[in-house]
């Protein structure tokens, strides 16, 4: 079982504010789709609510919540272990948020798909500190500069351990 975390993070690890992503980067949305399509995705309840309770198409959507989630295209799990038991064993599992789930799953992850956004605004939700682990090695990195569609500089990075 390969567990990966995918997130867009600001310079100070902000990932959200008021249950929304504080920036809009169409290229990052394409990157997210490319790296999660046809895979199992795990998310927490607040992330589920942030996507308006709509499962992401062409993915197995697994939501971790103490409150039961009833939706025909979603698997509800009340713990991380139950969520992992719901996954397809031979596929890469993509953890898509939020902060609590990232923090709990970081220990088990072997890959991080990060979009570093040159953003210094406020937030109330953060990605966990991952740089303290010296075992993470960058295996892919691509810089993008802001343009008419993407108002911030950003960089795609994949780390592995």
UniProtKB/Swiss-Prot annotation:
GO terms for cellular component: cytosol. Its EC number is 1.5.1.3. InterPro entries: DHFR, DHFR-like_dom_sf, DHFR_CS, DHFR_dom. The keyword Oxidoreductase applies. Pathway: Cofactor biosynthesis; tetrahydrofolate biosynthesis; 5,6,7,8-tetrahydrofolate from 7,8-dihydrofolate: step 1/1. Substrate binds at residues 6-8, 28, 59, 115. The keyword Thylakoid does not apply. NADP(+) binds at residues 7-8, 15-20, 44-47, 64-66, 96-101. It comes from the Bacteria. It holds the Pfam family DHFR_1. Keywords: NADP, One-carbon metabolism, Oxidoreductase. It catalyses: (6S)-5,6,7,8-tetrahydrofolate + NADP(+) = 7,8-dihydrofolate + NADPH + H(+). GO terms for molecular function: dihydrofolate reductase activity; NADP binding. One of its GO terms (biological process) is tetrahydrofolate biosynthetic process. Key enzyme in folate metabolism. Catalyzes an essential reaction for de novo glycine and purine synthesis, and for DNA precursor synthesis. Belongs to the dihydrofolate reductase family. PANTHER family: DIHYDROFOLATE REDUCTASE. This is Dihydrofolate reductase. It comes from Buchnera aphidicola subsp. Schizaphis graminum (strain Sg).
